[in-house]
């Protein structure tokens, strides 16, 4: 018989709809039993997603131990099996009527396909009318974790009704949580189900009751409530957020974000997302009318999106706006364009990339988000900025050019008065007063920067040699306000032109060695870098976007010590450095690496950024003939669990440490981790402005289900903690509970805040409470073990669109 098998057209929708709502977080199923609740059936086809896609076009094969009845009313007895593609239906007995389409399957009814497995007592129905009834069901998901049961299921075409159904991702022998519903209506054509009087139980205790709700049963989205978030903090009080999802169209949707904070009031938020063939975007807005603490309206708008113009060009934008300078402190969130704790950046631009070139045209603007500062701390706006880079090999040579043209603008700065009584709580409003007294008037200007270069990279198996010659030309067009700002000389069109020559050379030696019975490949990699740049007077040049690089091992091999084009240091210097590694030959892992280097200055370096027109540019120590600080980096893998690292800078001129850091990490069993770090940094200009911190964090598994988490981040100079986190986690096969207490510095004044966070993770379903994951992943490096081996997130790296000519040879 080769009739289409239509007995089970429904992949039992409750088994698919609930996991479709699951939170997108890493889940640990390691505590679950390895044995399936419903083991695979003998004789069933292997899971085959390709066969599942074409099952409707395949014939049905029926077999059994005995066949009786007539040609129109066949009866199969004993080990009855129906197979079609990836589908399998087994029963002890099967009676069919080919004229009426009726069938009855009884005794040990079993069904399996690529994504679903089920057992039942009885199944009956009519193939012609596509009506079916299955009783006493137990099911299991095959392609994901989940199982449950139902007293009965009635199917009519693509519409079904489940009676007294359950769903859980727990092991059936220990259902820590389950969803129960007396009645669930399912419509496969529309892609949704409707549950009535559904209850979420943890153990035997009902914790959530839904008298009526709709949910998706496939990838199609549906309007409805999402799981809430809630928490408690000293600043906001009780904090409750109830997302409401709106499915507006296949390619765009929205989420309403009503939020109640007992100390502030109601905040209204929304998130709108769109997607099309050439791009996508997202906009988020929040509005808090009459904040009870600040006594004024608060709000924010954030947008990010891109559009692919063609294979070479892409338009991108990231726009951020907040209503006041305390917004970021009061409503900490993942804000687009967060340049630092004191400012946010908005950018719009179009960017192109080819085989040998990159180009872009963009504009940006900065907004102040620190109430203790005035506009002098903000970077200049680039309105607009155009750049072009090109590089290409020519035989043994390589040539390239960097070109940039920028128009810089800046808002005038107005005086900020601190509170006279020293109180900085600000609960009754902004205690720092922004006055109408202008304390600095900013002019604007344009800058053109060109840097063509040619190099000759030569290399062999044990050496490399790269001579490079470049020419840098920088020209300005300044308005009269800026040109007449001290220390500038009044020249509205200053220029700078100078050559840059460098020679980079290195050797590579290796040998096989053995330590404590383990074979290693030991390398020795000396490197020398000579740089010559003649002196050019640059005090008549403004400083727009230029800052000194933080001195580090990588800085030993750059042709400038500045990030922007407003300063190009003069140099007659030689860097000598060496690196040595011990690589384990069995697997290539690095056991130990040591690097050290120093710059020898043959002349004083006269160019500095001091006394510039831009207060935000800071200042630097002048460089005299002699030697730079020694820079050393070391990493040591004690064993496969324990590693250490250190960075050290010692200044022979002051005979003091400029920088020191020590970090160690120990990996525990069951994904536990312990981190310990010490950081010291000396301000070479202001000895009173130093950094000395200790940081201890851990995830300690007490047993397979309980673990403790914590962080103690302490300022040794201020003698007070910067952040304290303590908490416990309980984990099981299908449920995780996290409880955290956090105390942290919330603003530049050093004020502390307290918060309590709870999160319940119903694995495979969703989570509710506050997002403790985000807090713990930031505070404990390695909270998720994979984070140790991933590329740093984009918000910790340089904007890829901000090409820096100083990083080009």
UniProtKB/Swiss-Prot annotation:
InterPro entries assigned to the protein according to its UniProt record, in alphabetical order: LipoPS_assembly_LptD, LptD, LptD_C, OstA-like_N
Any GO BP: lipopolysaccharide transport
Stated name of the protein: LPS-assembly protein LptD
Name of the gene: lptD
Family in the record: Belongs to the LptD family.
TM ranges: none
Pfam families: LptD, LptD_N
Signal sequence extent: 1-22
Origin superkingdom: Bacteria
Localisation: Cell outer membrane
Subunit field text: Component of the lipopolysaccharide transport and assembly complex. Interacts with LptE and LptA.
Cellular compartments per GO CC: cell outer membrane; transporter complex
Stretches assigned to coiled coil: none
Claim: Membrane is one of the keywords in the record: yes
Keywords in alphabetical order: Cell outer membrane, Membrane, Signal
Role played: Together with LptE, is involved in the assembly of lipopolysaccharide (LPS) at the surface of the outer membrane.
